[in-house]
Amino acid sequence: MSENKDHVVVGYTEKPVGERPTGGKFLGYDHLHFWVGNAKQAAGWYTSRFGFEYYAYKGLETGSREVATHVVRNKQGVTLAFSTPYGNDKDNQREMNQHQSLHGDGVKDVAFAVEDCHSIYNKAIQRGAKCAYPPQDLKDEHGSVTIAAVHTYGEVIHTFIQRNDYKGFFMPGFVAHPLKDPLNNVLPDISYNYVDHIVGNQPDNMMTSAADWYEKTLDFHRFWSVDDSMIHTEFSSLRSIVMTDYDQKIKMPINEPADGKRKSQIQEYIDFYAGPGVQHIALNTSDVINTVEGLRARGVEFLSIPTSYYDNLRKALTAQTSITVKEDLDVLQKNHILVDYDEKGYLLQIFTKPVEDRPTLFYEIIQRNNHQGFGAGNFKSLFVSLELEQEKRGNLTEIVKNIY
């Protein structure tokens, strides 16, 4: 259990629950696949702003006549893929164009690295998961990759990827990316250890069914949860459940809006994304201050946190003796980095502003110091900051309830 300065009490599971499920293990996140309007520009933006490097490519020059895909990754292996159709003649191109028209740029595939693709896929299908595509072996001179995919919430899919010691670039059919970003030679180096968690937003009253899907089809279990009695502001509130696999390599928080006086940032996402989808991606770092300062130098915009938050934080930390925050609080305040803690440790986190024109996808940078929570003590301060941005966009509107 965790109790922090705002007296928010949450529970999370520190150890695997029950017996190991049959079949192969989940090994972690393999990559995130975005469907976008211009894959080349999107990949370039992530190299210049977030410090990724060009990694792999598939397009006209490689014989791919229908879709172009640019893949970026960092030195630690965090991998993002961006795809754009060349036209609208084929079924897959029409699907991508319709997705773009409805949702804007967004995450289509949260791909999981797995030990046994066939086993995990077959079990999911037997338990009611809907097939996106069945198992197939992709091969080239560098080896083979086994993949299969199922639909999850909204139009998001999960691809199960078994790499079979594949030695090539990303996937069979890809080549080394021909571009190098010269800005990476002059801008600060950015280091992310891994994808910490990926958050999905659901419409009201859909969170539990989405969480249950992970438990039923993938043998995930509930790791952490909070409800609207804990997380609320004057205007809005949320509920959240975090689902994880047996080995806790993958963490998938599921959010939904709760009743409030005005439209919450969860509902704003649902409205502008036109349904459920990936709200934010959390990237783990060992040095959040250095990472954030480097990202700011590259032009990444972050939310602002009021001075009162840090005044209250200093008082709360002084009043307890369980943990010591090693970082300079003045530097954390200067960078608008949030702190949450329990009796065992603490975490540092910060959130970007939306990275699309639509107020949908954003990023979190997180540093964990023996703390496995998700910043429940910061949710209220975060919500207030998000509501200020909503108000600028004209979206912090009153909710009119239908009384009939």
UniProtKB/Swiss-Prot annotation:
Its EC number is 1.13.11.27. Residues 28-163, 194-353 form the VOC domain. Pfam families: Glyoxalase. Its cofactor is Fe cation. It is an enzyme of class 1 (oxidoreductase). InterPro entries: 4OHPhenylPyrv_dOase (IPR005956), 4OHPhenylPyrv_dOase_C (IPR041735), 4OHPhenylPyrv_dOase_N (IPR041736), Glyas_Bleomycin-R_OHBP_Dase (IPR029068), Glyas_Fos-R_dOase_dom (IPR004360), VOC (IPR037523). Keywords: Dioxygenase, Iron, Metal-binding, Oxidoreductase, Phenylalanine catabolism, Repeat, Tyrosine catabolism. Fe cation binds at H197, H280, E364. GO terms for biological process: L-phenylalanine catabolic process; tyrosine catabolic process. Pathway: Amino-acid degradation; L-phenylalanine degradation; acetoacetate and fumarate from L-phenylalanine: step 3/6. It catalyses: 3-(4-hydroxyphenyl)pyruvate + O2 = homogentisate + CO2. One of its GO terms (molecular function) is 4-hydroxyphenylpyruvate dioxygenase activity. Signal peptide: none annotated. Binds 1 Fe cation per subunit. NCBIfam families: 4HPPD. PANTHER family: 4-HYDROXYPHENYLPYRUVATE DIOXYGENASE. Belongs to the 4HPPD family. Key enzyme in the degradation of tyrosine. This is 4-hydroxyphenylpyruvate dioxygenase. It comes from Tetrahymena thermophila. The lineage of its organism: Eukaryota, Sar, Alveolata, Ciliophora, Intramacronucleata.
